[in-house]
Amino acid sequence: MDTSKKDTTRSPSHSNSSSPSSSSLSSSSSKEKKRPKRLSSQNVNYDLKRRKIITSEGIERSFKNEHSNLAVEDNIPEEEPKELLEKDSKGNIIKLNEPSTISEDSKVSVTGLPLNKGPSEKIKRESLWNYRKNLGGQSNNSEMTLVPSKRFTQVPKNFQDLNRNDLKTFLTENMTEESNIRSTIGWNGDIINRTRDREPESDRDNKKLSNIRTKIILSTNATYDSKSKLFGQNSIKSTSNASEKIFRDKNNSTIDFENEDFCSACNQSGSFLCCDTCPKSFHFLCLDPPIDPNNLPKGDWHCNECKFKIFINNSMATLKKIESNFIKQNNNVKIFAKLLFNIDSHNPKQFQLPNYIKETFPAVKTGSRGQYSDENDKIPLTDRQLFNTSYGQSITKLDSYNPDTHIDSNSGKFLICYKCNQTRLGSWSHPENSRLIMTCDYCQTPWHLDCVPRASFKNLGSKWKCPLHSPTKVYKKIHHCQEDNSVNYKVWKKQRLINKKNQLYYEPLQKIGYQNNGNIQIIPTTSHTDYDFNQDFKITQIDENSIKYDFFDKIYKSKMVQKRKLFQFQESLIDKLVSNGSQNGNSEDNMVKDIASLIYFQVSNNDKSSNNKSASKSNNLRKLWDLKELTNVVVPNELDSIQFNDFSSDEIKHLLYLKKIIESKPKEELLKFLNIENPENQSE
């Protein structure tokens, strides 16, 4: 039995422990005190890989190094602390005393590493970092977030009780009350409170809504707005194309997502209140009612749409039931009951015109942020456009701020831009406010680079003409011009055709200020449309038929006016003859004959018995003149007293010729020729 004990005590590990390296260490201390022998070695760890054995030589070397360092430090004289700024008697700064450099022995309390060294390779390894895993249990780095360890996140249980006595919120509890100024009728006002009152307390405690989280998956074909954002920033187009998927988490684990960096109501940037359920963000003043940024709601905040989805639990039956109850309870506003019900279930949105109104005019368009813009608005150039060579410029960041270029060398005054009437000099603290300014090589008018239209952009290495000048020399073609001018005009026109191909020139047929008599030549426009209705309420060009109808309508009205005047003239003439006949005592038959002679057209029944081709035209109108009418106008009372004698054949021929001549002329010219006043003028 004794031999077995000896064998167990003399194990290989024990024999190794009494190696020469360890014996030298024990021999130095054996003179002072002898080491007692061990009777058993059952609870001793003999794994030498975890031990650090220090020899006697190593102890002596480390001891000498420590004493040598102390001796050197003792010999260094201590310097007196100096002030940071040394000043003379007048108060001027003479010297700046920089603080002493940090010693290599100083360490960071958090990492335990010196300040002059970077992190070690062990810290750089991602395998040693703490990650939060996703739902599937996978450890993809793209879907993980760094989470501190539990020893740093532990909070004492009585932490709130310790600091609760120091709070002073009880002083303002009686002063602050919830405002009812912006309260509106809706599903979240009366319906929710009434339904909660009807629920028993046991069901209310057991009812737990599952956390609804949102995951955004960006499509690969998302387009980015390069004009509004640069260098990979989030844009509205990229996030609007993202497909949202709402799902329920069975394990109650959270999935982090990034909220939008623009307001969902007005599409503008600024400070937001982010929804904890969906990625939407809102300005504090864009919400209905607005929220005070100093008194934000505690806990998780949800937008109106998410609140409504959580309340109805994504059930259409619940939605219809609540909507019907709301309509029954609000009979006084039955017409707008559905509208009032849907007001609180939608997020506030800035008013925008419909697309068919926005796209009516070709020069008007909607900006990147939904604002109004037309051809008069100048789009500012971005940094990528300014500092690249796409527009023939070679600008660098070093040229972005140079105060000398903003001052006129001759007068010493600031150069003021012709377009914006500003200098935009910038400052040393804010050089980004500076804008490059240049002067015209012909009129010395200053222009900012971003104020110049793109059609007149300056190219380095050549003289530049500002937009105030005409682009080319135009020769006016005059009819009565010399040969050299006409040749110059032809040469200029030929050069223009050579320089710019496929360019059409339209020469007007009439000059400016030409007075025409209403004879306007209109080129008909043919439209190849297969449908008659107007799509999207677009404004079309003026149709050719509308001009024709207006022209015919004006002619018809003018003809009616002429007929009305002629009728009034004849009516006044007949009235005058009737009055003269009644004064002279003529019978009614004579008066009828006198009046019949004044009719301009008379039905001729002479051709009824004729057998020629014109026999069918029995009721032809023929212009007749009666000299009795003229004599009655000239001498109204002497017509009956005239005695008619027999005339010879020659006199009758002359009278017939005279009658033909008189009948060939109209009445107005004949009365004017005979110097007889018009009866119409006499009536007036």
Swiss-Prot record:
Source taxon at top rank: Eukaryota
Modification sites for N-acetylmethionine: 1
Entry-linked InterPro entries: Chromatin_regulatory_protein, Zinc_finger_PHD-type_CS, Znf_FYVE_PHD, Znf_PHD, Znf_PHD-finger, Znf_RING/FYVE/PHD
PHD-type zinc finger segments: 260-309, 414-472
Disordered: region residues: 1-48
Pfam families in alphabetical order: PHD
Keywords from the named record: Acetylation, Chromatin regulator, Metal-binding, Nucleus, Phosphoprotein, Repeat, Repressor, Transcription, Transcription regulation, Zinc, Zinc-finger
Low complexity composition bias: residue spans: 10-29
Keyword Transit peptide: no
Cellular-component GO terms for this entry: histone deacetylase complex; nucleus; Rpd3S complex
One GO-annotated biological process of the protein: negative regulation of transcription by RNA polymerase II
One GO MF term attached to the UniProt entry: zinc ion binding
Modified sites of kind Phosphoserine: 68, 683
Compartment list: Nucleus
Main location: nucleus
Task of the protein: Catalytic component of the RPD3C(S) histone deacetylase complex responsible for the deacetylation of lysine residues on the N-terminal part of the core histones (H2A, H2B, H3 and H4). Histone deacetylation gives a tag for epigenetic repression and plays an important role in transcriptional regulation, cell cycle progression, DNA damage response, osmotic stress response and developmental events.
Miscellaneous section: Present with 486 molecules/cell in log phase SD medium.
Subunit (UniProt): Component of the RPD3C(S) complex composed of at least EAF3, RCO1, RPD3, SIN3, and UME1.
Protein name: Transcriptional regulatory protein RCO1
Organism whose genome encodes this protein: Saccharomyces cerevisiae (strain ATCC 204508 / S288c) (Baker's yeast)
